[in-house]
């Protein structure tokens, strides 16, 4: 499997704090069958502002150690880019990374971002010649039960990603992700999803659930669809090809 959304670099955002935590997280992902992980540390003005050179330095350490430790594993560079006008300028100047240096970039919004602002933001990124991969679409209130809006995003030329944790079965009680899980299922049933990724941050609260999610998609939507969502579509964009 291929994971295009992960927080595996230590001491740069709200992901791992140490190199050992990074490697433990990667080990769990590897155990689940992932062989390519794109590191997408947060870039968010006012919240995650680690200098680019530090992120890349720590990424390089993680990549070297992980690829040495785990056979046939590839760690690639990217970022989860929170949309602001400042981010757009940095993307234009190539000061922040796309996914594996391709024309595809992982773009994030706040849960409360309006539909108008999401639409405008994605249009602005597309005008740079960069295709947005919209991170965890199930988190945005403006898209809840709004298949026409998501179709419009896709028809503009964007791709969509949902988190593997939100594919899992709802807990009977106190499932704080219940709303996200319902939305993710809705988008899957409407065939509006291009990628499932882990968005893993740590082993305690936000671990990877790719193996479990893959089984559920196979069972409910078929193996062919599962392979597209977990492997084939990601292979395409990481080679800089459209899906």
Swiss-Prot record:
Cited InterPro entries: Caps_polysacc_synth_CpsB (IPR048208), Caps_polysacc_synth_CpsB/CapC (IPR016667), Metal_Hydrolase (IPR032466)
GO biological process: capsule polysaccharide biosynthetic process
Pfam families, sorted: CpsB_CapC
GO molecular function, one term: protein tyrosine phosphatase activity
Cofactors required: Mn(2+)
SUPFAM superfamilies: Metallo-dependent hydrolases
Metal-binding among keywords: no
UniProt KW keywords: Capsule biogenesis/degradation, Exopolysaccharide synthesis, Hydrolase, Manganese, Protein phosphatase
Swiss-Prot/TrEMBL catalytic activity: O-phospho-L-tyrosyl-[protein] + H2O = L-tyrosyl-[protein] + phosphate
Functional summary from the UniProt entry: Dephosphorylates CpsD. Involved in the regulation of capsular polysaccharide biosynthesis.
Family from the record: Belongs to the metallo-dependent hydrolases superfamily. CpsB/CapC family.
Name of the featured protein: Tyrosine-protein phosphatase CpsB
């Amino acid at each position: 499997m291929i994971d295009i959304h992960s927080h595996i670099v230590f001491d740069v955002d709200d992901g791992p704090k140490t190199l050992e935590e990074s490697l433990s997280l990667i080990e769990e992902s590897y155990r689940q069958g992932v062989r390519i992980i794109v590191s997408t540390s947060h870039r968010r003005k006012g919240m995650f502002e680690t200098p680019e050179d530090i992120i890349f330095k720590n990424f390089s350490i993680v990549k070297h150690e992980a690829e040495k430790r785990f056979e046939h594993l590839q760690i690639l560079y990217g970022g989860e880019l929170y949309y602001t006008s400042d981010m757009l300028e940095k993307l234009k100047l190539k000061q922040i990374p796309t996914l594996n240096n391709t024309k595809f970039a992982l773009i994030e919004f706040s849960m409360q971002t309006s539909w108008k602002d999401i639409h405008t933001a994605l249009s602005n990124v597309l005008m740079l010649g960069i295709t947005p991969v919209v991170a965890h679409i199930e988190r945005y209130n403006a898209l809840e039960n709004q298949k026409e809006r998501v179709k419009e995003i896709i028809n503009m030329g964007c791709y969509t990603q949902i988190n593997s944790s939100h594919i899992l079965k709802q807990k009977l009680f106190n499932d704080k992700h219940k709303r996200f899980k319902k939305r993710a299922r809705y988008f899957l049933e409407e065939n509006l999803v291009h990628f499932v990724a882990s968005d893993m941050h740590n082993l305690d609260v936000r671990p990877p659930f790719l193996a479990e999610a893959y089984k559920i998609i196979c069972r409910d939507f078929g193996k062919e669809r599962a392979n597209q969502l977990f492997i084939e579509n990601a292979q395409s964009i990481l080679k800089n090809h459209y899906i």
